Structure formats: C-alpha cells, structure tokens
C-alpha cells in the first residue's frame, strides 16, 4: 500500500491484517443494527518512508475493540441513484488488553456518514454527502485506527478511508475529520452521465479545535466526470483538482463496488 502527502508519495508499506469478529446483527426493513467485539492483528513487513514518521504508528499490534452501529439504505439503485438516502453511524472502543490501550485510556472512535439523492427532473440529480470521523483517547493512534482521506470509494484500502474529490490517493489525516461533498449529475443519453462534484473538509488534532483556523486545516477539491452505466458495472473517468495536491489529477474505474 502507498500513502501520499499533499499528492506526493511519502510511504510504501506492506502489512498483514487478520480479523476475527464476534457479534450480532438484526435487520428491520432498510435499517441494520449491529454490535460485537473485534480482534485485529497488524503485522508490518516492509516500510519505506520519505518523511519522518512516529515509530508507534507502525508497531505490530493486537487490538481488541467493542463496536455498535446503525446502517440505513433506501437508495433506488447502486451506480446512479436518483432518490433515497443512505446513512450510517458507529462507535468503536479500541484496547490492547480489553480495558486499556498502552496502559492508558482506550481509544474512542465515532464515525458518521450521510448521502441523499434529490432529482428536480428526470435527468438531473443532486447528491449532497457528509462524512465525519473523530478519535479521542491517548493520542498515540496506530496506523490501523488513524484517519485517512482520499479516493472516490469509502474504505477502499483501509476501513477508515473517507473519499475526497481531488485527492486521488490515500493520505493520513488528523484525529478529527469532517468532510462535506456535493455531486451534480446530468443524464445526457441513455446510460450516459456527466457530473460536476466538489468536496470541502476540515481536520484538526482535537474535535473542539476543528473550527479554529490556527489549530486546524481546510481541504477543498473540485472535479468533473463522465460515467457510462453498463451491465457489468459503471465505466467512469474523472478530472479533478484540490488544494492538497495543487495539480490536476484523474481517476478511472470500471465495475461495481462490493
């Protein structure tokens, strides 16, 4: 896996991740409730970094976490929905011995996302979105938990990865991360669409500092894209820019996301 910083490759990483989950889930119509406990083991094999990094970030680690979550989805289709919404909220409590993390307080992670689709006409759809993820605890957050931003697909390389227009590759972020997005999609021919999209976000070391310009940083990105909806999945291409990369980038994709 490669990690980038402001659009430049900063880290090459190889690791093994093992997960054991014990829990329960219940569905009611379009909503799912889940809770349980996870055991995660991360073993880092190779690490090549161009930037100085905290060694604690990539220590081999065993994590025991308690989790609870709600997921709702009534979007009318997968690749180009025109109505409905999806949202999810979850809470994780991470430890390394069931009670503490490195002889300190456990790490709390609150995660929320929302996406809605509104169609003023049969060919035009407005899709706003919101993502938020906040960590609190000891402050020595490992790579397995730390916030990550970039790409177009949530959780593409790591479960905590949040998409952002104009940041096409995964980048590490601070402990408090809020992102808002907007996609304007127009159907031009049968199964063919063009979109204009944008993202704005803020991140900081502490949640209460996220609106303080001296303690936080903002991110902004814009893009334009084309999509063809085939029976094998959507074919997509996108041109974009962000104030993180400070250059025009591109993304291409094919197929459904599972």
Language model region names:
Residues 220-229:
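C-terminal structured domain segments
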Residues 1-71, 75, 149-161, 170-178, ...:
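Gram-negative/organellar outer-membrane beta-barrel architecture
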Residues 33-37, 68, 87-89, 128-132, ...:
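Membrane-embedded beta-strand positions of outer-membrane beta-barrel proteins
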Residues 1-7, 45-53, 81-83, 97-106, ...:
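Outer-membrane beta-barrel translocator domains and adjoining extracellular loop/strand segments
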Residues 14, 60, 81, 104, ...:
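A generic structural micro-feature
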Residues 185-220:
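C-terminal hydrophobic structural anchor segments
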Residues 5, 28-30, 39-45, 72-74, ...:
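Transmembrane beta-strands of outer-membrane beta-barrel pores
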Residues 67-69, 75-189:
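C-terminal outer-membrane beta-barrel translocator/porin domains of Gram-negative envelope proteins
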